[in-house]
Amino acid sequence: QAIRLLDNIATYKDKNKAFYQLNIGDKSEVKNQNSDKIEIKAIIDNIEHSQISYNSEKDISIAPFPNIIYISASRKGATSTIPLFSNFEIGPEGENVLNVIEHFSDEILADSLQGEAEGKTFSYVLSGWLQKISPDVKFEPKLAKQADISYSLYDQHRSSNVGYGLSYSLPVIVALLLGTLNQDSLVLIENPEAHIHPRGQYEMSQLICLCVEAGAHVIVETHSDHLFDGIRIFCKENKTSFADKVIAYWCQLDENKCTKVDSCHIKRNGKVDNWPQGMFDQFLIDAERLI
């Protein structure tokens, strides 16, 4: 939310509007109860070195800020129709995703993203990764532009009649692929693992890593040990020092309801330095009780 707030400030240059556009209330609602003010600063080193800061008691400091591609944890899911916009940007809940797919369908993507897809274009690669998430499913986007709606078919079934995993993963995959085409953008994804079975979560982790290797800038918020372990495996098996591109943070509240942030480093062998207590350890805890 902090990054999205800075993005809105850069867009609207109005503190109050920047807050309300995100539906998070005013600054009094998002400020920690133990803080006197809100202060946020972002420095983007690899995207034309831009910087923006916000202080609730001072003027806003604005410099160029990257385009944000944001996919919320609350996505449209298995709905019969998806809204269309007049632009080619994907909405936070996956709105306009089929219009975006049509617009970029013939764009050539990096060779590393192709995998087992039939071709290197956006549409082929997208279909290929959807099949990795849910094997042998045929995806068909349908647009009714005069009615400003769209819908998708999976094996000739409407999305409301198939599992949530496909419709929930679709905007995530599209956002990641867009990040490789627009490398001045920042891709923010909440819970890419939502409604996906463990094998599919692993495949999603591989796509995230491949897109970062292809030039995308990605921030992921996840509760999935399958996703995290998949990234660790990619670090171990990749020969291009991918681990050096990964930063992991573990956030939890302390006794004063303040957010405590611990960082850990994934080494090139996939092992983790400074593993924070409580981070993705429930499987081991449960396994010990079952043995």
Spell out what each predicted region is.
Residues 1-4:
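Glycine-rich phosphate-binding P-loop
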Residues 202-291:
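C-terminal lobe/lid and adjacent interdomain/linker elements of RecA-like ASCE P-loop ATPase modules
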Residues 190-191:
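Walker B catalytic acidic pair
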Residues 6-184, 262-291:
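Phosphate-coordinating catalytic segments in nucleotide- and nucleic-acid-processing enzymes
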